């Protein structure tokens, strides 16, 4: 037994205070997980000794567990969870049993109902501590996600539809003649048709891919036959690496020249009869500002160039009409719009898709294959080699269908949040915004900034400690970072899921973080 001499009375007096202190950790000044565990360890020690003094006087681990379970069973609804965790946390010593039992006593004091979890999946007390940490932060000052430009939370309706797809119709498409496969194929093609309707396109123009990166790489591979030595590929300094590297590498392979414009006007001035491809982002993932892709695609078409638009950011905050934009290619991912990762779209204009050859080969995209030759399926199927992500396609189509019912209101809310955010950031001393378009009644979907004397990584790390998720780094846009004369930046990207109150708390937390990172005069 632990030596309780001289400390029992103190523990009995301090135990309620210790519990109250831990409950107070739900507030905005919540600690990191490590600090949280330190608090729990002290609480566990106090609570165990107090319980021991009240009558559990045994070194026998089974007797200890039995008596504690009996006691806990009279006090809370976690009895089953208690038994499960004792079993699965490797409670092979008195110390481990004490930890398991008293973590659960703490859960009860904090009002955490563990019955909603499958406790058989908890294999260590560290995992149990992490679960309690997450639960205590699910309060009025919950974790605030502001990195939607990277990946958006999956919509509940998407999760429900994906679950139904897996449970009720999880069969390969375009292969079997049995009923389940035919149902799966019909669902897959309906999802394709719904995506096409949303984009004002036709189903045969919609190619499902693994995401925007694969879409753009596939476009570059497909278009390699259109590029020869001495030709030019035109892009901008604002591109995400996914719409820069494929064209850079294509130019290197073909002996062509990659021309990089520094503005929309500069891009237009660089168009020539040598331009074969114009690759441009619809919306910058760093600045959050839009390009007039309709005008740029028109100018590209007038010179005989093929236009490729990266819509990864734009699709999340606007409703692109591809007939109106009149581009040749358009690419985006599902995970930016509330669907899952691993699914995306490559739109290819009908008059062009029929002339193109596939760049990936395998099952599902071939009509006939002999030792010497083969013939391919018609578009878009010839561009979908292998088993497609038909479950992901359901998620993507569901996300677009769900959003289309209320998107005008959602987009308006986002712009209101962005204007509020950018205004608040603009008022912070020493903070340099890379774009303040929202303050000039222009659409802006994210805000990136640097701060004199503070490294973006430090800012993001400290904001995380305060419960805010933001992105820091080069944002997969090194050419733009070089053009702007910086190495890294902090990016804040809210969505319609956020609130004005969360933006206000973020701005307050940021100012507190900057007091740590910088002196009062903004210097290191």
Language-model-detected regions and their locations in the chain:
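Pyridoxal 5′-phosphate
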Residues: 133, 137-524
């Amino acid at each position: 037994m632990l030596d309780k001499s001289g400390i029992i009375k103190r523990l009995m007096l301090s135990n309620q205070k210790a519990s109250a202190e831990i409950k107070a950790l739900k507030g905005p000044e919540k600690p990191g997980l490590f600090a949280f565990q330190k608090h729990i360890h002290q609480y566990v020690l106090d609570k165990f000794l107090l319980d021991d003094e009240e009558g559990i006087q045994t070194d026998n681990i089974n007797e200890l567990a039995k008596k504690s379970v009996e006691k806990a069973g009279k006090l809370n609804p976690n009895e089953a969870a208690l038994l499960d965790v004792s079993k699965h946390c490797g409670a092979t010593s008195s110390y481990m049993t004490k930890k398991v039992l008293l973590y659960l006593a703490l859960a009860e004091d904090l009002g955490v109902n563990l019955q909603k979890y499958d406790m058989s999946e908890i294999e260590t007390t560290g995992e149990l501590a992490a679960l309690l940490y997450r639960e205590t932060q699910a309060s009025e000052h919950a974790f605030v996600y502001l990195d939607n430009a990277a990946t958006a939370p999956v919509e509940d309706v998407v999760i429900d539809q994906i679950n139904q797809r897996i449970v009720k119709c999880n069969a390969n498409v375009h292969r079997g003649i049995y009923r389940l496969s035919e149902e799966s194929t019909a669902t897959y093609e309906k999802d394709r048709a719904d995506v096409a309707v949303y984009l004002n396109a036709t189903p045969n123009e919609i190619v499902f891919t693994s995401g925007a990166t694969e879409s753009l790489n596939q476009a570059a591979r497909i278009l390699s036959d259109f590029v020869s030595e001495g030709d030019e590929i035109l892009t901008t300094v604002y591109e995400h690496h996914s719409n820069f590297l494929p064209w850079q590498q294509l130019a290197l392979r073909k002996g062509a020249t990659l021309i990089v414009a520094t503005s929309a006007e500069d891009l237009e001035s660089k168009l020539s009869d040598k331009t074969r491809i114009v690759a441009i982002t619809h919306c910058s993932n760093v600045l959050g500002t839009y390009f007039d892709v309709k005008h740029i695609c028109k100018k590209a078409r007038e010179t005989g160039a093929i236009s490729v638009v990266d819509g990864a950011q734009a699709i999340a905050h606007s409703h692109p009409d591809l007939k109106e934009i009149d581009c040749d290619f358009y690419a985006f991912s599902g995970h930016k719009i509330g669907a899952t990762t691993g699914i995306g779209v490559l739109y290819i204009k009908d008059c062009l898709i029929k002339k193109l050859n596939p760049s990936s080969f395998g099952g599902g995209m071939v009509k006939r294959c002999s030792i010497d030759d083969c013939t391919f399926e018609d578009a878009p199927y010839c561009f979908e080699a292998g088993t497609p992500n038909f479950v992901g396609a359901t998620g993507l189509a569901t996300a677009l269908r769900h959003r289309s019912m209320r998107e005008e209101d959602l987009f308006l809310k986002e712009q209101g949040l962005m204007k509020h955010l950018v205004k608040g950031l603009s008022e912070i001393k020493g903070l340099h915004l890379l774009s303040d378009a929202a303050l000039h009644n222009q659409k802006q979907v994210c805000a990136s900034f640097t701060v004199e004397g503070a490294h973006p990584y430090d800012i993001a790390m400290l904001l995380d400690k305060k419960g805010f998720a933001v992105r820091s780094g080069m944002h997969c846009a090194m050419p733009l970072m070089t053009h702007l004369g910086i190495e890294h930046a902090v990016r804040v990207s809210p969505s319609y899921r956020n609130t004005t109150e969360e933006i206000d708390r973020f701005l307050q937390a940021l100012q507190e973080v900057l007091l740590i990172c910088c002196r009062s005069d903004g210097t290191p």
